[in-house]
Structure formats: structure tokens, C-alpha cells
UniProtKB/Swiss-Prot annotation:
Binding site for Cu cation 2: 131, 189, 1061
Glycosylation sites: 121, 236, 361, 478, 489, 831, 944
Name of this protein: Hephaestin-like protein
Parts of the chain on the Cytoplasmic side: 1113-1114
Entries under PANTHER family matching the protein: MULTI-COPPER OXIDASE, PLASTOCYANIN-LIKE DOMAIN-CONTAINING PROTEIN
Keywords for the protein's UniProt record, in alphabetical order: Copper, Copper transport, Disulfide bond, Glycoprotein, Ion transport, Membrane, Metal-binding, Oxidoreductase, Repeat, Signal, Transmembrane, Transmembrane helix, Transport
Organism field: Acropora millepora (Staghorn coral)
Length: 1114
């Protein structure tokens, strides 16, 4: 009988043999690709094909598409990747029309090698840099100081007329995870100066597939594959701008810095086409379709791609909208079951107006059989809904519910929006809203829950149901109802665009005042919740005659589709005690159909300048369900209730929201959270069982939105239930002080990625060089630091493993069941606190300063005075951990919450890590399940919002002049926005070192403002994100108030770039290096443990059959 050691040895040998077989079966896929200069037309038809008008007759399109004395128009010179037949680069391969300006699609299976022979036919240096594959330093194609030279630098910038051969290996360490699609989406692009290279046009898509997924280069089991890249191509940032200016009829008088000229060159495109001009998105009714979707670009590049008339799945979840940020790549699986011409558009309002839409065509093809989705055995649910005009008050109490001040108190944040005078409308506006009636007479309204505010009634249905909406338009403008998440034909879509239908089929799209139309929608299995979804998934309906003006006018509501058996006979939920809907949006009343009427009613219209920035700002109402500054009523529940929160985002580029629920956590798609990020057209279902009684804040964690009133409160009553939460684990003591120090954002004095001194770098000196009216790289800040005892007489020195933390406070570790005790001393010169995310705390230990109905001792934690000490006690229940479907440890944060905007920008934030039981070494806070963990905070620390701005001006500016004038200067304010990682810029973050094949956890933190959308990209490696199942990525999307854990086993040695992929953030220094050392350099070999036994097939691909034979013989 074989003993255990021999059995293990044979199993290992068999595994190696299987890897070798895979490697033998692998192939080399060779591509010949050149960078070539071509003329590119963004709208070759000359028409807005969605509206059916010439571009010059469309007021929105003329901004971008009309050529003039000082306008380039719609045709630009670009440099594009194109594929050729062979190394002679003489015969270009056919390029699918729908790919537009994108390069060819590169495909390969795990085990393959992709070899790209690249020729640069452009007029300056370019390269090819891939995402999602294994490469060595001579095939990275990215220019930065990575401590290589010679042959390892030739890939970084290929000169004009030059060639380079890139070899990219598709190892198991970059394979699609088990529950992912067979082929996952990545990109490749030039990375010499990536922001300019990409805007010039050098970008393409790459698909990495499981073994056996491709059949003669095509994905098996898929009828059609399409690629769609959403981006605002900024031609101002193209290398060919000067050449393109020559296209103007009076080029010598063009001012490239003119704001209107720059705006005209921002092309809101899908695959390089706008206003419906993207061709070739044709499929057959019944086709199985894969959509490979990507985003790239800058801070404006928040895209939500909406497919009318169809649904799809991403990561097993039912959707009809895909969220795309710079360097976000997703694969969507669609069954084309709804014939017709359908719109594909970005739901961000400005992007829609700027032409980011096209048509895709689902046709009944000869010989192709499609089965129409049908419903049977369900109910017919009828709703009578009217569009009514009402006066809406965004602050009906007249009071800021968070601090008790009047909404019109002079100098308050709220007065900007609520003060009424001859040139300001104030807080009450005429709007159109959806309201429900009892029957078709539209005489008796159905009462609605007060928390819904200006939202329309909740439409609910189960799978197999029919929804009938009898809609009456009582308003003065044409309106409609367009739904998400249900099945409808062209006569029931409710969206007005040129889709080839007859006039009779368009009655649903444009319901006139006083008219009635009946919509009929169904909920077949094909559009219902998947097994991975919540019992009811969240959608919206809204008017779509003009989707921008209609929604800003107030016409939207929630729609829920539920699994069979979820609803009671009265349409309420069986599985929940309460259900709440929350819409986070900045309602731009200047874009409402009623804007002119509101000026007449509430102000003196003659005196108002519509283009005045302060006036426009006063009309941007940062609300939750149409209420600001904690005026939202009705969010009340009992301890232990099952609560379903349905959260919705709508709006514009600024509508990047992170909803934060103080005091309790929820589950969302298998993850335990207390924040959820929302973009326009993003909807989510959250499940909460509140265990913490009290009045709790519910806010948007984006700083400007918070200060502009996107705040509410929800109340958890005890309802005679026991609120006591018991923990049985350890008590972990931490001694933390806040104190002021001088912080240096770039202590080396170098732009480490460029190899230049800071004052010699055009980009770096904007932020880091001191002058008469510039602070430079050093600022006084407040930071959290750990001490050894409650006397605070000895600061705890940071170890080499903690060097990377930078400005962050200490890592606080605990396991589920533990209690955390933080003895906090405020050694700074103003009030601060410590507030944790995710944990269980009483009101006396929340560390947050707002009106929560408490007094006395329960208020002492809110703001600790200088020189004082306070002890916070936080418990760690199961719902504070990563959950059964999450990673080993969940990432949270703690920060001062007296004034969360100024406190965090002053520097007071740190990481909080909560692990499953048994993941911390006995007697320590060290992890037992990983070799290393690193915390990375990506944020633009806005020193203009620091408490210490005046002190920093006085201390560091050499000749500041009038302080208030300086503080209002745009260039000065920009110089104080430090685009950092852990408080370091331009490659100055140190300490990110690891060895090959170690298990590494990266703990990611996001905080900040509207610009703080960060796409964290690791060169050289990929990582796994766990959300029920694993997902392979090399870019992670971070928003303010979002915290995440990702897992990596690095296999490619070298010094690698780690950066935010948002263009302006890269340019402003949000990048650094991390080092992967050869495993042979480890001084002390570690025993094989669960943490170090990760194996990737790339380790074995160099083994030979003789080696295997020796192993087996032994």
C-alpha cells in the first residue's frame, strides 16, 4: 500500500504531466501589426442617424462635427493599429467595419504564446503594451524607469520605421477564473506617453480564453462577437493636434487654449464613431452574442452602456447596462431575442447629448430559428400612472437635519441652493412627476410611501407576469414611459429615435398632453433575476422623449422584477419586512423643461444670466429622492427586520455616488459592505438586517455631494427587541494619537518614474516646486500614529512591512468575534475623532458629529478636544467580516468624522482589516494566510480643503501676497491637489516588495471627491477579486468610500508600474513602482503552508519530459 508521501509525490507528478500536455498542445499565434497614420471620420454619413437629421442641423452635434475657421470638424488624422498579412507589411488584412478606429482583435488560449511583430509607421515613437498576459521586461511596451537597460528597453519605444517583436505568454496565472466566461476581455495600447498615445488612436482589444475555447480563431458556442469601446477621445491631447488644426479654414488664428475650441475636439465616441454612425452591429434573431466592452480615458470617462430592448449577464447577474471606467473591461453574454433596430447609448447625460450612441440590429435571418420569450402562469399587473405637474420643495422643513441650521443661514453650504432672490430660484421648483391612480378615470390617487419623494410609484412584477401601464400625460410637454429590465416590442418601448418603425409604432414614444397610452411589458425567464441575483432586482422607468430633459424634469420611478413566488397577493414582498428605494442624483434644474417657467415664478427672469456659473450651481440639487440636507422622511424600521434597499443612480458626469449607511452593513451580490457605488444608470439591490438601534446618517461619501446636501438619516427602533450584541473573541488594544507633522509628498526630490528632478519635470513641478505663490511638495498635516501604551510617551516604530503605509494611520486588525479598543489621544490643535466603517458601535463610540437624537455621554465621542483622550470600543460581529463568499479578510477604513471632508484632506485616515476566524497569528495582528499584505489609498488629497491651508501658505509660499486672492486663484488651487498613493506622488512611495509566487493581498482604499474615480492598474501581474466567485483582473475600480481586497500571486519578476489609469491622474503623479524579486533570493525558505502552496502552470512550462520521467522513477 502506497504511503501518504509517495501518494502525494505521484499526484504532484501527474499534475506536472498534465501541465506539460497542455503546454505541448499550445500554439504560437503570430500577428503582424503596424502603427499607421490614417484620416478618420467620426460621422462619415454626415447625419445624426438617431434623430434622422444632418449634423449641421443638430445644435448638439454642430459643436463637434462642423468645420469652420477655428474648428476642425469631424475628420482628424490619427495613428491606428492595423494588421498585415506578413512581415513585409505591404498587404493590410481586412478590418471589420464595426471595430472602427480600434486595432485588430488579438486572441489566444491558455498555454499559447502571442507573438506580435510590430512596425512603427508613425512619425514618432510608439509601442504596444498588453493587459492580462504574462510578459518579461523586453515585451512590456511601457516607458518608465524600471531599472532595466539594453535589450529590455527596446520594447518601450519603437522609433519611426523601426520594428520590435513582442512575446506574450498566456499562462494559467492569467486564465479566466472558474466561474468566468470562456474568453475574457483585455486591451492593448501604446504606452510611451499613454494619455497622448491613446488619444492619438493606438488602442485595441485582446481576448484571453480557456483551453479549447477557440475553434479556428472563433469562440465556440458563440454566434457573434462584438467589441465596443466607450471613450471621449480628446483630440487636444493627440500628438497630431497641430496637423489637425491645419484643417481649419483659418488655422493661423486658432487658439489651442480656447475653452470652446478644446470642447469641440472632445469626441464622445463608440469605437471612434458618434451620432449613430457606428456600422456593422448586425446579428440574427436567436443568436448567442458576446459583447466585449471597454472604457478608457480621463475623469469624464464614466460610461454606462445601455442596450435597449435586450438584456444580458455580466458575472452571472442580469443587466441591461454595463458600467465602464478608464481601463475597465467586461464581457457581457446576450441572447438576441428581440428583433428590431435598437439603440446602444451611454446613459451619462452630457455624453448622450454629445453623440455617444449608435444602433444595433437584430434581424430574423433565413434558416435561423429564434424562440420568442413567452410568459405563462403569471399575473397581469395593471398600473394607472399619470405625469402631473407639481411644485416640489427640496427642503420642506426649512432646516438642515444634520446640524439644525436654517437652510438659508448666511454663509452656509445650504444657502447656495435654498436662498431665493431676484437672481435665484431657491429650493422650490415646478416639476413633472409620475403619480399612481386607482383606475383609468385618473381621479383618485394611490397613496405612496413618503420616502419615495418625487419618485414615481414602485412597479413590481414576478417572472412570467404581464405588466400593463395605462399612462396619462397631464403635463404640458410630450412625455412617455420607457422601462428597463422587462421585455417589450417596438410599439411599447417608450423611447423616441429613428429605429425604422412606422408612425403607428411610435405612438408609445411621444404621448402628447392630455393623451393616454397603454404600455404592455412582460417578464419572461430570459429577462428575470438569475440564480446569482437577489430575489428582486432593481430597475427604473423614465420618460424618454428627450431622456435628458425629461428626467431632469422629474419623470422617473423604480421597477422591480422578482423571482417567482416572491410577492404576496397585494404586491408586497414575502421575504422582507420593509422595502426602501433611494435615488441618488444631482438634479440639474437648468436642464429641466420647466426652467424658464421656474425663473418666471420664483425670480426675476430678466435679471438672470443663464451662463453665470454661480446661478447654474444654485440649480444643481444634490438630492436623495428629491430631498437635501436630511429632509428625506420615512426611513424607519425595527431592529432585526429584513430590509431591502433598492438604490438607483441617474444623471451626468458628476453623478458618481457612494451611498454610505452608518451604523449597519448590508450584503450586495455576495459581499458585505456599508457603502455602494452608483453611476448614472446603475441600479442595485441591498439586503440589510439592522442590529444597531439609533438614528443613523445615510450620505453620499463623495465630498462635494456631501457638502451640497446629499444627506439623509434612517432610524432603527428597538421595537422591544434585544439590541445587545455579544462577542466572544479577543479584545485588541490600539493606542493611537493624532498629531501635526510636516509631510513631504516627494521626499526623494525626483520624479522617480521619469528619472528627472522635480523641477525639471513639466508635470511634476506644477505640484511639487515651491515659489512665491506655490506651496510645493511639503505641507503641514495631521496624521494618526500608533503608540505602545496609554501614556503616549513612545511612538511605535513602523517595520519594513509597514513602510509603504505613508500618510496612513496604522493597520488595525481583528477577527470576526473580536472587540477593538482604540485609546485615542488628540495631540493636534483642533477637534478630531476616530470613526470606523463596517463595525458595530454604540452612539458613544461612533466618532461622528451630526444630529442623531443623542445627548450627554453619547456625544463625547463626536469631537475630541486638543490634548484630550477618549476610548472607543467597537465590536466585530459576523456582518463586519468578509462573509462566507468573500476573501479571507475584508478591508474597511477609519477616519476623523468631525468634518469628514476637511479632516480626511488634512490626513486623518487609516486601514481597518477584519478577517475570518483563524486568519491572524496567535498573539499578534499578523496574517497567517498570506505572505504579505499592502494597503494602497488612491486619492487626490485636496490641500485647499485642509484645515492647515492658511498655515501652509504662510510657512511655504515665498511671497504669497493677499491670502484670499491667492486662495481663489485656479492655478494655485490646482497646484494643491496632490494625486497620491498613500500620500506620495511621482513614484515616491517605497516598500512595495515581494517575492515570486508569494501570496499577496492588496487592500485598496478610495476617498475623496468627484475626480476620485481611480482605476488601479498593476503592470506585470493579474489579480483575483472574490465576489462569491473569483474574477481575473489587472485593474480595480475605486470610488470615494469604497474599500476592497484583491489577491495576487506574482509570477513575473521585475520592478513594475502601479498607477491609476485615468489619464490626468497618471500625468499628475498617481503612480509608483512595486518590486517582484526572484524567489531564489529569499534568505530563509518558508515551510509549505496554505499561504505558500499556490501553484501556477507558468512554473512548470519549462520542465521537460526527461525531468518528469526522473520524478516518476524516483
Amino acid at each position: 500500500m502506497m504511503d501518504r508521501s509517495n501518494a502525494a509525490f505521484v499526484l504532484t507528478a501527474c499534475f506536472i504531466f498534465s501541465q506539460l500536455i497542455c503546454h505541448v498542445a499550445a500554439i504560437t499565434r503570430t500577428y503582424y501589426i503596424a502603427a499607421v497614420e490614417k484620416e478618420w471620420d467620426y460621422a462619415p454619413s454626415g447625419y445624426n442617424k438617431i434623430k434622422g437629421v444632418k449634423l449641421e442641423d443638430d445644435s448638439d452635434a454642430t459643436v463637434f462635427a462642423t468645420k469652420g475657421a477655428h474648428r476642425i470638424g469631424r475628420i482628424y488624422d490619427k495613428v491606428l493599429y492595423r494588421e498585415y498579412e506578413d512581415a513585409s507589411f505591404t498587404k493590410e488584412k481586412p478590418h471589420p467595419k464595426y471595430l472602427g478606429f480600434l486595432g485588430p482583435i488579438l486572441k489566444g488560449e491558455i498555454g499559447d504564446t502571442i507573438v506580435v511583430h510590430f512596425k512603427n509607421n508613425g512619425s514618432r515613437v510608439y509601442s504596444m503594451h498588453p493587459h492580462g498576459v504574462f510578459y518579461s521586461k523586453d515585451s512590456e511596451g511601457a516607458l518608465y524607469e524600471d531599472n532595466t537597460k539594453g535589450k529590455f528597453k527596446k520594447d518601450d519605444k519603437v522609433p519611426p520605421g523601426g520594428t520590435h517583436t513582442y512575446s506574450w505568454h498566456l499562462t494559467q496565472s492569467h486564465a479566466p477564473a472558474d466561474q468566468e466566461d470562456k474568453c475574457i476581455t483585455w486591451i492593448y495600447h501604446s504606452h510611451v506617453v499613454p494619455s497622448k498615445d491613446i488619444n492619438t488612436g493606438l488602442l485595441g482589444i485582446m481576448l484571453i480564453c480557456r483551453k479549447g475555447a477557440l475553434n479556428q480563431g472563433q469562440q465556440s458556442g458563440v454566434d457573434k462577437e462584438f467589441v465596443a469601446l466607450f471613450t471621449v477621445l480628446d483630440e487636444n491631447e493627440s500628438w497630431l493636434l497641430s496637423k489637425n488644426i491645419e484643417r481649419c479654414s483659418d488655422p493661423t488664428r486658432v487658439n489651442p487654449d480656447d475653452e470652446d475650441f478644446k470642447e469641440s475636439n472632445k469626441m464622445h465616441a463608440i469605437n471612434g464613431y458618434f451620432y449613430g454612425n457606428l456600422p456593422g452591429l448586425d446579428m440574427c434573431y436567436g443568436d448567442s452574442v458576446k459583447w466585449h466592452l471597454a472604457g478608457i480615458g480621463n475623469e469624464v470617462d464614466i460610461h454606462t452602456a445601455y442596450f435597449h430592448g435586450q438584456s444580458f449577464t455580466i458575472d452571472g447577474h442580469r443587466k441591461d447596462v454595463a458600467s465602464l471606467l478608464p481601463a475597465t473591461f467586461v464581457t457581457a453574454s446576450m441572447k438576441a431575442l428581440n428583433p428590431g433596430k435598437w439603440m446602444l447609448n451611454c446613459l451619462v447625460n452630457d455624453h448622450y447629448n454629445a453623440g455617444m450612441y449608435t444602433l444595433f440590429n437584430v434581424t430574423k435571418c433565413p434558416g435561423k430559428v429564434g424562440v420568442a420569450p413567452s410568459v405563462s402562469g403569471g399575473k397581469k399587473r395593471t398600473y394607472f400612472i399619470a405625469a402631473n405637474e407639481v411644485e416640489w420643495n427640496y427642503g420642506p422643513t426649512g432646516v438642515n437635519g444634520m446640524d439644525g441650521q436654517s437652510l438659508i443661514a448666511p454663509g452656509s453650504d445650504s444657502a447656495v441652493f435654498f436662498a431665493q432672490n431676484a437672481q435665484r430660484i431657491g429650493g422650490t421648483y415646478l416639476k413633472a412627476i409620475y403619480e399612481q391612480y386607482t383606475d383609468a378615470r385618473f381621479s383618485t390617487k394611490v397613496p405612496k410611501p413618503e420616502h419615495l419623494g418625487f419618485l414615481g410609484p414602485v412597479i413590481r412584477a414576478e417572472v412570467n407576469d404581464i405588466i400593463e401601464v395605462v399612462f396619462k400625460n397631464n403635463a404640458r410637454f410630450n412625455f412617455s414611459i420607457q422601462p428597463h429590465g422587462v421585455f417589450f416590442n417596438k410599439s411599447n418601448e417608450g423611447a423616441l429615435y429613428e429605429d425604422g418603425t412606422s408612425r403607428a409604432q411610435k405612438a408609445d414614444d411621444n404621448v402628447q398632453p392630455g393623451q393616454t397610452f397603454t404600455y404592455r411589458w412582460t417578464v419572461p425567464e430570459e429577462v428575470g433575476p438569475t440564480k446569482s441575483d437577489a430575489a428582486c432586482i432593481t430597475w427604473v422607468y423614465h420618460s424618454s422623449v428627450d431622456p435628458v430633459k425629461d428626467t431632469y424634469s422629474g419623470l422617473f420611478g423604480p421597477l422591480l422584477t422578482c423571482k417567482k413566488g416572491t410577492l404576496n397577493n397585494d404586491n408586497t414582498r414575502k421575504d422582507t419586512d420593509k422595502e426602501f428605494v433611494l435615488l441618488f442624483t444631482v438634479t440639474d434644474e437648468s436642464e429641466s423643461w420647466y426652467h424658464e417657467k421656474n425663473k418666471e415664478m420664483k425670480a426675476n427672469a430678466i435679471l438672470i444670466n443663464d451662463d453665470d456659473e454661480d446661478y447654474k450651481e444654485s440649480n444643481k440639487m444634490h438630492g436623495i429622492n428629491g430631498f437635501l440636507y436630511a429632509n428625506l422622511p420615512g426611513l424607519e424600521m425595527c431592529l432585526g427586520d429584513t430590509i431591502s434597499w433598492h438604490v438607483i443612480g441617474l444623471g451626468n458626469e458628476v453623478d458618481m455616488h457612494t451611498a454610505y449607511f452608518y451604523g449597519n452593513t448590508f450584503t450586495h451580490q455576495g459581499s458585505v459592505k456599508d457603502t455602494v457605488s452608483l453611476l448614472p444608470g446603475v441600479f442595485g439591490t441591498l439586503t440589510m438586517t439592522p442590529d444597531n438601534a439609533g438614528d443613523w446618517a445615510l450620505v453620499c461619501r463623495t465630498n462635494d455631494h456631501y457638502s451640497a446636501g446629499m444627506q439623509a438619516k434612517y432610524k432603527v427602533n428597538t421595537c422591544n427587541r434585544n439590541p445587545e450584541l455579544k462577542t466572544s473573541g479577543k479584545t485588541r488594544d490600539y493606542y493611537i494619537a493624532a498629531f501635526e507633522m510636516e509631510w513631504d509628498y516627494a521626499p526623494t526630490g525626483l520624479d522617480a518614474l521619469d528619472g528627472k528632478k522635480l523641477d525639471q519635470s513639466e508635470e511634476a513641478k506644477v505640484f511639487t516646486v515651491t515659489s512665491d505663490k506655490r506651496i510645493g511638495r511639503k505641507y503641514v498635516k495631521a496624521v494618526y500614529r500608533e503608540f505602545t501604551n496609554d501614556q503616549f510617551n513612545q511612538q511605535k516604530l513602523r517595520t519594513p512591512a509597514e513602510e509603504h503605509l505613508g500618510i496612513l494611520g496604522p493597520m488595525l486588525h481583528a477577527e470576526v468575534g473580536d472587540t477593538i479598543k482604540v485609546v485615542f489621544k488628540n495631540n493636534a490643535n483642533r477637534n478630531y475623532s476616530v470613526h470606523p466603517h463596517g463595525l458595530y458601535y454604540s452612539k458613544a463610540h461612533e466618532g461622528s458629529d451630526y444630529n442623531d437624537g443623542t445627548s450627554g455621554a453619547d456625544k463625547l465621542d463626536n469631537a475630541i478636544q486638543p490634548g484630550k483622550t477618549y476610548t472607543y470600543i467597537w465590536k466585530v460581529p459576523e456582518r463586519a467580516g468578509p462573509g462566507k463568499d468573500g476573501p479571507a479578510c475584508a478591508t474597511w477604513a477609519y477616519y476623523s468624522d468631525v468634518n469628514p471632508i476637511k479632516d480626511t484632506n488634512s490626513g486623518l485616515i487609516g486601514p481597518l482589516i477584519i478577517c475570518k476566524k483563524g486568519k491572524l497569528k496567535e498573539g499578534t495582528e499578523e496574517r497567517s494566510d498570506v505572505d504579505r499584505e499592502f494597503v494602497l489609498m488612491f486619492t487626490v488629497l485636496d490641500e485647499n480643503e485642509s484645515w492647515y491651508l492658511d498655515e501652509n501658505i504662510k510657512k511655504y509660499c515665498k511671497n504669497p501676497g493677499d491670502k484670499e486672492t491667492l486662495k481663489a486663484d485656479d492655478d494655485f488651487m490646482e497646484s494643491n491637489k496632490m494625486h497620491g498613493i498613500n500620500g506620495f506622488v511621482f513614484g515616491n512611495l517605497k516598500g512595495l516588495k515581494m517575492y515570486q509566487d508569494e501570496k499577496v493581498d492588496w487592500l485598496l482604499l478610495g476617498i475623496g471627491n468627484e475626480v476620485d474615480m481611480h482605476t488601479v492598474h498593476f503592470h506585470g501581474q493579474s489579480f483575483l477579486r472574490k465576489q462569491v466567485s473569483y474574477h481575473r483582473e489587472d485593474v480595480y475600480d475605486l470610488f470615494p468610500g469604497v474599500f476592497a481586497t484583491v489577491e495576487m500571486v506574482p509570477d513575473s519578476t521585475g520592478d513594475w508600474l502601479l498607477h491609476c489609469h485615468v489619464n490626468d491622474h497618471m500625468v499628475a503623479g498617481m503612480e509608483t513602482l512595486y518590486s517582484v524579486l526572484d524567489k531564489s533570493l529569499k534568505t530563509t525558505p518558508k515551510p509549505i503552508t496554505a499561504a505558500s502552496s499556490f501553484v501556477t502552470s507558468s512554473i512548470f512550462i519549462y520542465l521537460s519530459f526527461p525531468v518528469l520521467a526522473m520524478l516518476l522513477k524516483a
